[in-house]
Curated annotation (Swiss-Prot):
Function text: Catalyzes the removal of terminal sialic acid residues from viral and cellular glycoconjugates. Cleaves off the terminal sialic acids on the glycosylated HA during virus budding to facilitate virus release. Additionally helps virus spread through the circulation by further removing sialic acids from the cell surface. These cleavages prevent self-aggregation and ensure the efficient spread of the progeny virus from cell to cell. Otherwise, infection would be limited to one round of replication.
Membrane topology category: Single-pass type II membrane protein
Molecular function GO labels: exo-alpha-sialidase activity; metal ion binding
Keyword annotations of the record: Calcium, Disulfide bond, Glycoprotein, Glycosidase, Host cell membrane, Host membrane, Hydrolase, Membrane, Metal-binding, Signal-anchor, Transmembrane, Transmembrane helix, Virion
Native organism: Influenza B virus (strain B/Victoria/3/1985)
Further remarks about this protein from its record: The influenza B genome consist of 8 RNA segments. Genetic variation of hemagglutinin and/or neuraminidase genes results in the emergence of new influenza strains. The mechanism of variation can be the result of point mutations or the result of genetic reassortment between segments of two different strains.
UniProt comment concerning the protein's domains: Intact N-terminus is essential for virion morphogenesis. Possesses two apical sorting signals, one in the ectodomain, which is likely to be a glycan, and the other in the transmembrane domain. The transmembrane domain also plays a role in lipid raft association.
Residue spans crossing the bilayer: 12-34
Name under which the protein is recorded: Neuraminidase
Bridged cysteine pairs (disulfide): C86-C419, C121-C126, C181-C228, C230-C235, C276-C290, C278-C288, C317-C336, C423-C446
Activity regulation, short description: Inhibited by the neuraminidase inhibitors zanamivir (Relenza) and oseltamivir (Tamiflu). These drugs interfere with the release of progeny virus from infected cells and are effective against all influenza strains. Resistance to neuraminidase inhibitors is quite rare.
Virion surface side: 35-465
Organism phylogeny: Viruses, Riboviria, Orthornavirae, Negarnaviricota, Polyploviricotina
Catalytic activity: Hydrolysis of alpha-(2->3)-, alpha-(2->6)-, alpha-(2->8)- glycosidic linkages of terminal sialic acid residues in oligosaccharides, glycoproteins, glycolipids, colominic acid and synthetic substrates
Length: 465
C-alpha cells in the first residue's frame, strides 16, 4: 500500500510567462526512495485579462490559462535487514544517561523513576525505552518503586540522548515487562501486565493497539526486556512463562505489522529460559544469550532459523560463565550441558554481534563481581560455535568498575548509512531499598575504532543528596 506522502506539482501557463508552483503535503522523510509514479489530470480555468489595443471597439479578447497537475506518489520505505557491521575492533564509552543527576528539578522536568532500560533503533532514530513506576524524583510516590510488578508501571520511551523526564517521555502502554523494535516502516511496541496468574502480552503497531497473547503457564508471563528483532517485515519476540525457581519454557512470537502470525516452540535444553538478549548472526539466524534463574550460571543460547521458523536451545559451553551469581570460571566439569552449582538467581546479560565479511564476533557483558550486581566487563569471541566451544572468552575491558552498580545489560545496533554499529547498554541501578526511590542510569558502549577500551562509567549520583 502506498503512503499518504504526496507531492503535487502544478504548472500554470499564462500569456505573460510561466509560474511554477510546488505544493508539498505531508512528510518529506521518504525522499531517498527513487521510484516515482506520475499521474496527470488536466484542468482548465478562464481568468479575466485586460488587453491594450488601438481599436478596442472592434476586438474581443479571450484568454485561457491551462493547468497541468502532476501527482508524485512516493513508495513506502523498505523493510529492514541486518547488514555488515561498521568497521572497528574495540568498544568505547559512547553515552551516559544519568537522569537523577538532575534530581533537583521538579514538575515536568523531573526525571522519571525507571528500571529495565533498553534501546531499539529504526532506520532514522534510536529510542531509549524503560519501565517507569509512574513516579518522578523528587516526589511523594517512592513507595513501591522497588517492586517488579504493579498496576502503575508503564513502558515509556524518549529519543536516545534525551533525559527520560516527565515532559520528554512518551507513555506507550501499561506494562511491567516490555520490548520494542522497528521493522523499517513502523515501530512495534510490546507490553506485559496483569495479575501473575493471568498476565497478558499487548502489541502496539505505530499508534494502534493491534493484538494480544495470553498466559500459557499462568506464572508471570513475561518478555525479554530488550529489543525484538525484525527482518523483511517479520519481527521475532522471545517470551517465557513459568516459575522463577523452576520450569519456565520460552516461546517466540513471529509478528508482522503488529499481529501475531506464528508461535515458535524451541527444542533442546528448554527447562528455564528467560530475559533473552537477541540479535542477527546472519540473514538466516537469530541468536540469543539468555538467563536461567534456577539451574545454572551458564547462559542458555538460542539459535532461531528465520527461514524455517524453528529454534533450538543449548547451554553455552565456554568456561567463562556469564550469569550472576556464578562459580569460578572453569570449575564446572562434565559435558557442555552440565549445569554445575550456584545456579540459583540470575541477571539479564548483554550480547551483540559484529558481522564481518569473513568472520563473526560475539560480544558479551557480565558483572565483575561473582556474587553481586556490581561492575561490568566486556568479552568477545570470534567465530566458533557457542554450543560447543569450551575455551574462555577474551576480556576486552571494564565498562563499569566493581565499585559501581552493574545490573541488567543488553545489546542493540545503530543503523549507519551503509552498515550497523553494535552496542551494549548497561543498567546502573540506584538501589535505595524499600524506603526511598529505586531507579537507574544507562551506560552505552559501542564499536568504534581500534585499540583498547579506555574508560569506565560512573553514575555520579549520591542518593543522600
Amino acid at each position: 500500500m502506498l503512503p499518504s506522502t504526496i507531492q503535487t506539482l502544478t504548472l500554470f501557463l499564462t500569456s505573460g510567462g510561466v509560474l511554477l508552483s510546488l505544493y508539498v503535503s505531508a512528510s518529506l522523510s521518504y525522499l531517498l526512495y527513487s521510484d516515482i509514479l506520475l499521474k496527470f489530470s488536466p484542468k482548465i480555468t478562464a481568468p479575466t485579462m485586460t488587453l491594450d489595443c488601438t481599436n478596442a471597439s472592434n476586438v474581443q479578447a479571450v484568454n485561457r490559462s491551462a493547468t497541468k497537475e502532476m501527482t508524485f506518489l512516493l513508495p513506502e520505505p523498505e523493510w529492514t535487514y541486518p547488514r555488515l557491521s561498521c568497521q572497528g575492533s574495540t568498544f568505547q564509552k559512547a553515552l551516559l544517561i544519568s537522569p537523577h543527576r538532575f534530581g533537583e528539578a521538579r514538575g515536568n522536568s523531573a526525571p522519571l523513576i525507571i528500571r529495565e532500560p533498553f534501546i531499539a533503533c529504526g532506520p532514522k532514530e534510536c529510542k531509549h525505552f524503560a519501565l517507569t513506576h509512574y513516579a518522578a524524583q523528587p516526589g511523594g510516590y517512592y513507595n513501591g518503586t522497588r517492586e517488579d510488578r504493579n498496576k502503575l508501571r508503564h513502558l515509556i520511551s524518549v529519543k536516545l540522548g534525551k533525559i527520560p523526564t516527565v515532559e520528554n517521555s512518551i507513555f506507550h502502554m501499561a506494562a511491567w515487562s516490555g520490548s520494542a523494535c522497528h521493522d523499517g516502516r513502523e515501530w512495534t511496541y510490546i507490553g506485559v501486565d496483569g495479575p501473575d496468574s493471568n498476565a497478558l502480552i499487548k502489541i502496539k503497531y505505530g499508534e494502534a493497539y493491534t493484538d494480544t497473547y495470553h498466559s500459557y503457564a499462568n506464572n508471570i508471563l513475561r518478555t525479554q526486556e530488550s529489543a525484538c528483532n525484525c527482518i523483511g517485515g517479520d519481527c521475532y519476540l522471545m517470551i517465557t512463562d513459568g516459575s522463577a525457581s523452576g520450569i519456565s519454557k520460552c516461546r517466540f512470537l513471529k509478528i508482522r505489522e503488529g499481529r501475531i502470525i506464528k508461535e515458535i516452540f524451541p527444542t533442546g535444553r528448554v527447562e528455564h529460559t528467560e530475559e533473552c538478549t537477541c540479535g542477527f548472526a546472519s540473514n538466516k539466524t537469530i541468536e540469543c544469550a539468555c538467563r536461567d534463574n534456577n539451574y545454572t550460571a551458564k547462559r542458555p543460547f538460542v539459535k532461531l532459523n528465520v527461514e524455517t521458523d524453528t529454534a533450538e536451545i543449548r547451554l553455552m559451553c565456554t568456561e567463562t560463565y556469564l550469569d550472576t551469581p556464578r562459580p569460578d570460571d572453569g570449575s564446572i566439569t562434565g559435558p557442555c550441558e552440565s549445569n554445575g552449582d550456584k545456579g540459583r538467581g540470575g541477571i539479564k546479560g548483554g550480547f551483540v554481534h559484529q558481522r564481518m565479511a569473513s568472520k563473526i564476533g560475539r560480544w558479551y557483558s557480565r558483572t565483575m563481581s561473582k556474587t553481586e550486581r556490581m561492575g561490568m566487563e566486556l568479552y568477545v569471541k570470534y567465530d566458533g560455535d557457542p554450543w560447543t566451544d569450551s575455551d574462555a572468552l577474551d576480556p576486552s575491558g571494564v565498562m563499569v568498575s566493581i565499585k559501581e552498580p552493574g545490573w541488567y545489560s543488553f545489546g542493540f545496533e545503530i543503523k549507519d548509512k551503509k552498515c550497523d554499529v553494535p552496542c551494549i547498554g548497561i543498567e546502573m541501578v540506584h538501589d535505595g531499598g524499600k524506603k526511598t526511590w529505586h531507579s537507574a542510569a544507562t551506560a552505552i558502549y559501542c564499536l568504534m575504532g581500534s585499540g583498547q577500551l579506555l574508560w569506565d562509567t560512573v553514575t555520579g549520583v549520591d542518593m543522600a543528596l
